[in-house]
């Protein structure tokens, strides 16, 4: 059933590229484990052991706080189609805000999206596939655009103000690095 791989191969990359969403879970030694769903065609495979996603401003910034505390994370893709499969990527995150070296290195790989807050790079240590037989069969209706429409309507100044209020510390009080030079 479950198989481990040291890196992504062409078949796994094709599977990732076909998925409309993914989940990222992260944690530090103490505090809550965070789990977030992500979409918006913002995930990119950059190499067999490297991927990244464009992170949009949201109500929290847990992954950034956890990246500062060691970066342990798992990214999961699962197929909701007739071809079941679950793919987990185990590794560590690094986060780069606009203007950072990480941002400059990878930003051109992403479409510009309103509210883009940071790029989360993920160094893959191992991959695991599982059957996915317990995952429900569902049909994608459409990608939600509410979040990017919200930030486009608010504009950059209001978005930056929101980040300063809501994204500087995690729900456990850990610094996220947002706003640091």
Residue ranges with predicted function:
Residues 1-181:
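Binding-site signature for planar aromatic cofactors or substrates
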């Amino acid at each position: 059933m479950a198989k481990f791989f040291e890196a992504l191969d062409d078949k796994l990359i094709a599977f990732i590229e076909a998925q409309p969403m993914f989940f990222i879970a992260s944690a530090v030694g103490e505090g809550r484990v965070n789990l977030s769903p992500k979409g918006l065609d913002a995930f990119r495979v950059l190499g067999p052991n490297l991927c990244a996603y464009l992170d949009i401003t949201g109500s929290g910034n847990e992954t950034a706080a956890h990246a500062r505390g060691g970066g342990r994370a798992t990214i999961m893709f699962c197929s909701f189609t007739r071809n079941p499969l679950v793919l987990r990527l185990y590794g560590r995150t690094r986060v780069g805000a606009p203007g950072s070296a990480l941002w400059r290195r990878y930003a051109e790989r992403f479409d510009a999206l309103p509210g883009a807050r940071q790029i989360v790079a993920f160094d893959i240590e191992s991959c695991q596939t599982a059957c996915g037989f317990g995952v429900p069969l569902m049909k994608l209706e459409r990608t939600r655009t509410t979040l990017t429409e919200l930030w486009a309507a608010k504009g950059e100044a209001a978005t930056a103000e929101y980040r300063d209020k809501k994204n500087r510390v995690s729900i456990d009080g850990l610094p996220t690095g947002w706003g640091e030079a």
